[in-house]
Amino acid sequence: TQVFHPYIKKNRGWKRILLFIEFAGVAFIFGLMCVAYLQCHYIINRDMGYQPKGVASCKHDFAEPDNARNNLKSLPYVEGVASIRGSMTWFGNREVTDEGGKVLFTPRCAAFDKDFVPLLGLHIKTGRNFTGERQFLVNQPYVEKMGWKGSGVGEIVPNRGTVVGVLAPFCCGVLPADNEPLEIEYGTNLRNVHVRLKEPFTENLHRLNNEMKKIYPQEDIEFRSLEQDLERYYRPTIIFRDATFLAFITILFITLMGLIGYINDEV
């Protein structure tokens, strides 16, 4: 039997190396799983800077926007109506130039009507909401990019209008709050209509869509939950979290089987 001792010792060495690799893999995947879980928890539960709960939206070009707004306001389960160009999941971009036409920077941009800020529960930390044409709301990074020394209220956006308010930080889609300069201009009868519904939200959303089919039978109008639209942008993070959890369970099972086999061989 002594002839086989070197082979047995060599075989044990490989088993130990394999076990070490497996335990290292478990530790790595466990760490990755913890990071993914914390990231997912932060994104889903962070303060958005506004209140998406109870809000539904629909992108549609109404032939008579004022009439459509009045129809929505008349419904007993609708608390408010507002509109936006863009959406709360993405904003466009527009160059800001000086009076000579030189490009200064390119902020995220959108247009709100005067009811959108209160409907969503956005906060204005300085100044006021806009009331008419050629008025703008911006955020603090925008003020800093422009090099304005004061709060920014009353400053002129070259060739375009006046800043009337500075918004408190809020999230656009999955982007962190105040991640980039933001410029919101005043608009009316914008394409993306938002409504705030009374509780129970799901039931009233169903009633709203049925009512739209009755009023506009020839048009495809469907309001969707803003919260669910936001969750679609979190889905890749949720999928990655679940994938790391499954990988951890799999490699942990393999490692335990290897450990049990090693112990049985040694006993």
Residue ranges and their predicted role:
Residues T1-K9:
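Short cytosolic juxtamembrane segments of multi-pass membrane proteins
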Residues V3, I17-F20, A36, A68, ...:
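Structural preference for long, well-ordered alpha-helical segments in enzyme cores
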Residues V3, I43, Y233, D265-E266:
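Amphipathic alpha-helical segments that mediate coupling or scaffolding at interfaces
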Residues R12-Q39, T237-V267:
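Hydrophobic alpha-helical transmembrane segments of multi-pass inner-membrane transport and secretion
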Residues L19, Q51-V55, G187-N192:
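Acyl/amide activation-and-transfer machinery of modular secondary-metabolite enzymes
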Residues Y37-E144, K149:
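Structured, solvent-exposed hinge/loop segments at the ends of secondary-structure elements
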Residues A63-A82, E133, Q140-W148, N159-R241:
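"Rare, low-scoring activations can occur
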Residues V153-E155:
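A glycine-biased structural micro-motif
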